[in-house]
Structures are given as C-alpha cells and as structure tokens.
A protein has these predicted regions:
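Glycine-rich ThDP/TPP pyrophosphate-binding loop and its adjacent helix/strand module
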Residues: 1-167
C-alpha cells in the first residue's frame, strides 16, 4: 500500500500487526520509513503502541541516509541517535549498512527470531547509490532524470548489478 502522508505507513503497519495477533495469523508486517519521516510525532505514537502490544511480528526499516527534501537531516531537525530512540521504545534494534545485501539478509533473518518486541532495522544508506551524479544529492528527492541522465543512470546501475551477480 502507499503509506500516504509521512508517518502514516508505520501506523497502518502497527494496525496490520495487531490484526494478525488478534486473528491468530502468523504473518509478519514490514514497513519502510525515512530518517526525515521519523521526525513526525505519529511515528513515535505508533512505535509506543507497537512495543506496548509486544508486536514481534512487526519490522520497521529506517532508511538512514541523512537526507530529506529540505536538506541534511542534521541541519533540519535531527532525530539522531535513531537506534537509541527505538531502543527507548523497547524495540529490538539492528544497525546495518543498508547498501550491503548480505547485511540486509542477515538482519531480516535475525528479525524473524525476535520474540516479545518489535524490531527496527536501522539501515545506513547512500541516497542514489550506484548512480554517480545522484549519490548523496538531496536535489534528486522527488525529481526524475531527463532522457540523457536516465541513460547514464541505467548504464551505471547495470554495471553495478553485474558486479553483484559475480560476487
């Protein structure tokens, strides 16, 4: 589902996780939030409820790239340290390099073993990773490349994908 306005995705995910618990279903709910998005109070209200309800079927992935539409997170309204905030809300926290597929895989496997509390995976990422002119550039937030930029980006991503397949 589209999460709508900032902060609403985690609230919907908490509702889905509660529904699974109440209905006796064993599915897991995953939601992705940005480090800019977690400045929204609704995120922390939902997190508090998730921990209170011991939603061990909920995994919150935080895309921690230090950039949001208005600029660097640290210059706009810093939520750091993100991991400590989720720990304070009684989440099991896993810090990873969000651009490392092996670490991502390991984090999801670990999250499945957690009992009695929700999990937050704090994924340190590079915005625009793999495209030289987009990496760590806040100006690409919500902006589409032109035809030439698209061609260059796809060539760079294809090379990166080939390198991953050879790993």
């Amino acid at each position: 589902m589209s999460s709508g306005s900032l902060g609403q995705g985690i609230s919907a995910a908490v509702g889905m996780a509660i529904t699974a618990k109440l209905s006796g279903d064993d599915y897991r709910v995953y939601t992705l939030v940005g480090d800019g998005e977690i400045q929204e109070g609704q995120v922390w209200e939902a997190s508090m409820l998730a921990a209170h309800r011991k939603l061990d079927n909920l995994v919150v992935i935080v895309d921690n790239n230090n950039l949001q539409i208005d600029g660097a997170i640290t210059e706009v309204n810093s939520p750091y340290p993100i991991d400590k905030k989720f720990e304070a809300f009684n989440f099991h926290v896993i810090n990873i390099d969000g651009n490392d597929f092996d670490q991502i895989d390991a984090a999801f496997k670990e999250a499945k073993t957690v009992k009695g509390q929700p999990t937050a995976i704090i994924a340190k990422t590079v915005k625009g990773k793999g495209v030289s002119f987009m990496e760590n550039q806040v100006g690409w937030h919500g902006k589409a490349p032109n035809d030439e930029e698209y061609k260059i980006a796809m060539e760079e991503l294809e090379k990166a994908g080939e390198a991953l397949c050879q790993k």
